[in-house]
C-alpha cells in the first residue's frame, strides 16, 4: 500500500482552458509521486465523508476525475462510495487501485467508515490511498478529532480520540494556515484546545500542499510542517523540504 496523507492536494490556480475548480498541486513532488504510484488504468474509488450528501459527492467525483486527467494519470473508471451503495463496499474496495478518502467532518466520516467496517476492508489493500483533510485524520489508528463545529470544544460528551482505520500512527491536523487563528466556543483552537489535547500525543500540523508519503514501511514528510507534542509547537520543515520520519 502507498498512502498519501494530505492537508489538501488541490491547487486553485487552474490553467486557462481547463473547466475545473482545481487541479492537483504539484508542489513538494505530490503529482510526481502520485504518477509514480498509480498503475495506469486503475479504478478510482472516492469514499464520501458525508454518506447522504449525494449531489456534493457526485460533484467531488467529477472534480477529482478531472484532476487525475489534468495530471496525466490514466484511470479506467471513477466510483463514489456513499450510502447509496455502502452495501457493496467490500466489492468496490477490492476492485479499486486508488482510493480517495474525502475531507469533511471527522466524526461524521469516521462513523460512516465504521458502519462499513472499512478498517478491515483496507487491511490487505495493496493500491494507493489518498487522504484529504478529515480523510487523512481518520487514517490513524487512534484519531484525534480536533473540535471543529460550534459546541464541540465545550461538550463533555464529545469524543476527541476515536478509533480510526489503522493505516498509520501519525495524527494529521490539516489546513494550518487557514485555521491557526480560529476561536471555537471562546477558546483558541491551537493554544487553548489542541495544545492541551497534545499531552501524551504527537500531532503533525500541515498547511495545504504538504503531505506525508508512506510506502513499504517508510514515511516521508514532504513540505512545510509543524509538530505539537505535550503542548509545545515546533517547526519541522520548510516548503520544498523532505524529512524521513
Model-derived features with residue positions:
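C-terminal and late-domain segments of enzyme folds
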Residues: 1-40, 58, 62, 145, ...
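ATP/NTP phosphate-donor binding region
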Residues: 16-92
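Short glycine-rich anion-binding loops that position phosphate/pyrophosphate groups of nucleotides
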Residues: 50, 104-106, 134-135, 177
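Catalytic-core regions built around general acid/base machinery
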Residues: 92, 115-126
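An anion/phosphate-binding loop that grips the pyrophosphate of nucleotide cofactors and donors
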Residues: 96
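Catalytic nucleophile loop
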Residues: 100-102, 123-142
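Glycine/threonine-rich flexible loop motifs
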Residues: 106-115
Amino acid at each position: 500500500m502507498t498512502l498519501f496523507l494530505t492537508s489538501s492536494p488541490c491547487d486553485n490556480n487552474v490553467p486557462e482552458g481547463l473547466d475545473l475548480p482545481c487541479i492537483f498541486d504539484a508542489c513538494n513532488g505530490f503529482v510526481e509521486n502520485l504518477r509514480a504510484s498509480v498503475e495506469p488504468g486503475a479504478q478510482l474509488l472516492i469514499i464520501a465523508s458525508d454518506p447522504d450528501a449525494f449531489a456534493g459527492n457526485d460533484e467531488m467525483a467529477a472534480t477529482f476525475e478531472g484532476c487525475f486527467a489534468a495530471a496525466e494519470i490514466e484511470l479506467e473508471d471513477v466510483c463514489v462510495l456513499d450510502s447509496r451503495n455502502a452495501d457493496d463496499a467490500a466489492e468496490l474496495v477490492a476492485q479499486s487501485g486508488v482510493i480517495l478518502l474525502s475531507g469533511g467532518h471527522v466524526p461524521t466520516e469516521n462513523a460512516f467508515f465504521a458502519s462499513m467496517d472499512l478498517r478491515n476492508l483496507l487491511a490487505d489493500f495493496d493500491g494507493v490511498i489518498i487522504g484529504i483533510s478529515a480523510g487523512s485524520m481518520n487514517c490513524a489508528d487512534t484519531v484525534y478529532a480536533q473540535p471543529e463545529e460550534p459546541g464541540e470544544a465545550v461538550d463533555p460528551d464529545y469524543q476527541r480520540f476515536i478509533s480510526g482505520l489503522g493505516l498509520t500512527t501519525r495524527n494529521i491536523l490539516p489546513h494550518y494556515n487557514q485555521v491557526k487563528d480560529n476561536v471555537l466556543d471562546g477558546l483558541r483552537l491551537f493554544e487553548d484546545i489542541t495544545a492541551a489535547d497534545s499531552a501524551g500525543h504527537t500531532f503533525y500540523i500541515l498547511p495545504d500542499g504538504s503531505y506525508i508519503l508512506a510506502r513499504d514501511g517508510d514515511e516521508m514528510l514532504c513540505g512545510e510542517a509543524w509538530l505539537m507534542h505535550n503542548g509545545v509547537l515546533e517547526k519541522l520543515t520548510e516548503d520544498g523540504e523532505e524529512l524521513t520520519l
